[in-house]
Amino acid sequence: MIAKSSNKPTKVKRTWGHYKVLYEGKGFKVKELVINPKSSLSNQKHKHRSETWNIVKGECFVLINNEHIQLTIDKGIFISVNTWHKGINNSDKPAHIIEIWRGDILTEDDIERAKLIM
C-alpha cells in the first residue's frame, strides 16, 4: 500500500473550526479536526464511509442517532456508515479530534446534512 503524505498538512477553515488531512491511502484517510469552543458540526451522515473519532485534547459531545455521548482525552467512538452524528464542543477550549475515515469513496461531498425544521 502506498500512502500519500505531505510535509505540512493544509489547514481548511470551517465555521466550526478547522481540519487538516494528515495521511491517506487506499481505503482510508486520517484527519485532525479542531472544533472551536461553543461550536458544533452539522448533524450529518455518510453513505460511503465509516468514521472513528478519538479525542486527543479537550472534550466534546457526540450526538449519535439522538444519543449524547461525552468524549474526553483518549476516548473514542466508531460511527458506522449511514449513522447520523454531530460533534458538539460546549467547553471554553478547542476540542482536538483524530478522525479516521474508512471506505471506498473518501470525499468531502459524501455528506448528507439533516434539514433544520423551524
Q: Which role does the model predict for each range below?
A:
Residues 7-45, 49:
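A short glycine-rich, His/Asp/Glu-containing loop-to-beta-strand
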